[in-house]
């Protein structure tokens, strides 16, 4: 691991690593709160993120890094409940070679609880990440390059005293009807539906919600009539964290970087057909165990059960490989109430 704050002075930084041989998955971790974000392996030309908050007690920061040897130019558009905004100061912005820039989004999108952004790169390519502060609680919003009409959101808490929301941004020209089907143990929960106008944002509250009982973690299946970007926001009245909806992959890595362990960890097959999943568990660079399991259509399986106990995931790295890009890995950190800090698996390439 690398702690850049031991190497330089400054409030914001970017880190670029060159790997000689083999391949790696990397993650940035907030050492205080345990929240983390997968690192990118290349710059992109279009990037979306949702669920930002600039109300009193919160701040939303956008950081962009230019990984190339030539200058890059980009625009930023915001999507709010009231419509879209293209702040003049965030149009045609230039980023020098191997330079990093940060912007306080709240200076332009003032006192807005739920908004999304789109970064459009006009020249070159960029790596982008959002940094959301909520009452002193920090989390990373690593966003996405692809909008989705469907997604699976595992491990969404319904615990008492917890907060759970699905925040949605619609960057497209047509309104979207978004339906959330909530799977929660033996309970039958009515679908939660919201309308998201063109170039707008909206929110569905999962917890607290009188239609959804407090019964552990729910799996939510999202369906939308138009491609959208969604973020799960969880926490308590003392602060919230943001977790972008994961993109299914064929190879996913779950790493307990801090050594604090996981409360729950699951793998979900989002395909309508069953698949085989092989796994390799490593601890301190050494092979601990391996195995293979079958995973049914749209099924979720506990990773603790898979490897023989939750304790075996503590301080370890688990690599799961499927037959196609249909796997989503999610985990929750150990918190009170349970499930209020989510973390995602890393794309294993």
Spans of model-derived segments:
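Transmembrane beta-barrel architecture of outer membranes
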Residues: 12, 57-63, 71-73, 88-90, ...
């Amino acid at each position: 691991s690398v702690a850049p704050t031991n190497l330089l002075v400054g409030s914001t930084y970017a880190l670029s690593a060159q790997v000689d041989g083999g391949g790696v998955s990397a993650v940035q971790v907030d050492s205080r709160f345990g929240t983390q974000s997968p690192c990118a392996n290349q710059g992109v030309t279009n990037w979306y993120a949702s669920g930002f908050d600039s109300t009193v007690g919160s701040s939303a920061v956008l950081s962009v890094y230019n990984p190339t040897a030539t200058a890059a130019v980009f625009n930023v558009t915001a999507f709010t409940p009231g419509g879209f905004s293209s702040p003049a100061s965030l149009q045609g912005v230039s980023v020098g070679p191997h330079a990093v820039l940060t912007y306080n989004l709240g200076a332009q999108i003032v006192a807005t609880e739920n908004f999304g952004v789109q970064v459009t790169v006009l020249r070159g390519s960029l790596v982008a990440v959002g940094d959301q502060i909520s009452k002193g609680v920090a989390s990373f919003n690593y966003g996405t390059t692809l909008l989705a009409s469907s997604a699976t959101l595992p491990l969404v808490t319904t615990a008492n005293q917890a907060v759970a929301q699905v925040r949605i941004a619609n960057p497209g020209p047509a309104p979207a009807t978004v339906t959330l089907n909530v799977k929660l143990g033996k309970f039958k929960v009515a679908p939660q539906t919201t309308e998201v106008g063109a170039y707008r944002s909206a929110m569905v509250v999962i917890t607290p919600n009188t239609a959804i009982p407090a019964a552990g973690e729910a799996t939510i299946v999202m369906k939308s009539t138009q491609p959208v970007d969604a973020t799960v926001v969880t926490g308590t009245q003392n602060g919230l964290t943001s977790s972008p909806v994961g993109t299914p992959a064929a190879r996913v890595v779950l790493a307990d970087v801090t050594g604090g362990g996981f409360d729950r960890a699951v793998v979900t097959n989002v395909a309508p057909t069953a698949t085989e999943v092989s796994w390799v568990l490593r601890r301190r660079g050494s092979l601990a165990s391996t195995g293979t399991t079958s995973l049914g259509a749209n099924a979720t399986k506990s990773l603790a059960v898979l490897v023989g106990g939750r304790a075996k995931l503590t301080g370890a790295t688990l690599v799961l490989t499927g037959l196609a890009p249909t796997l989503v890995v999610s985990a929750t950190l150990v918190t009170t109430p349970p499930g209020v800090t989510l973390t995602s698996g890393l794309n294993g390439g």
